[in-house]
Amino acid sequence: MALRAVAGTAAPLLGEPLPVELMNTVWADRDGLHDELRDAAGLAAWLQAVAGRFAAGAEGGGPGLAVALPGGRPGRELAGQFRELRDGLRGLAAAVTADPRARAAGTGTPDVAAAVRAVNAACARAPLWSRLTWASPPGAPARTLRSAGTGPEAALSWIAEAAVLMFTGPDAGQLRACPGPGCVLYFIRAHPRREWCSAVCGNRARVARHYQRHRPGANWPGPDTPGSQD
């Protein structure tokens, strides 16, 4: 799976469930760690890039969010709430995966109880409710989600709700911390042969192993040195 940025966001989007994509708004490259949610502009760019994912069926056949996204511009306060949710999710992911990556340390909420509080607070930010639509034949009944919040507020709660389902469902057992050199990303191991978050990390790891085999004792960058994503 190729590593890419979409529609103006600098953050990598790997086609993962949205809670994982949110976790991956912290990423690393040869210049160090980056945070797409460092300000409201970065959050707005990321929401624009993933807006289509909130449509009906876009997330594993789940209900769509009937609030236009990115409807409304997120402000500094909401950007902070997205960071709190993201850091909470990264903290829980680190606990679930027993994440050994030193470079990823400090990119998530280290205390599980605090991380859970962050997720629950985000769920309550703009509560969602179901709405039934019943189209005339040949249509079919459909469920959408509504919210009284703005688009960005509803997106925050939607992602938090999706994270609750992820951590309490089968995907939790497939959540992985990418072992690529210097990588700090997470992914869902949807295929038993998948080892890396992206082909970029897989290729880098293979090059590292090849180099080590042919240059015994060489000081090749390890998994916690700069240089994960280009």
Q: Language-model features: where?
A:
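Cysteine-rich micro-motifs
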Residues: P192-G202
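Cys/His-rich microdomains that often coordinate metals
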Residues: G182-F187, A205
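Cys/His/Pro-rich metal-binding microdomains
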Residues: P179, V184, S198
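Short helix-coil boundary/hinge micro-motifs
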Residues: M1-A177, L185, G217-D230
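Aromatic side chains
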Residues: Y186-F187, W196, H210-Y211
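Short metal-binding segments enriched for Cys and/or His
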Residues: A205-R215
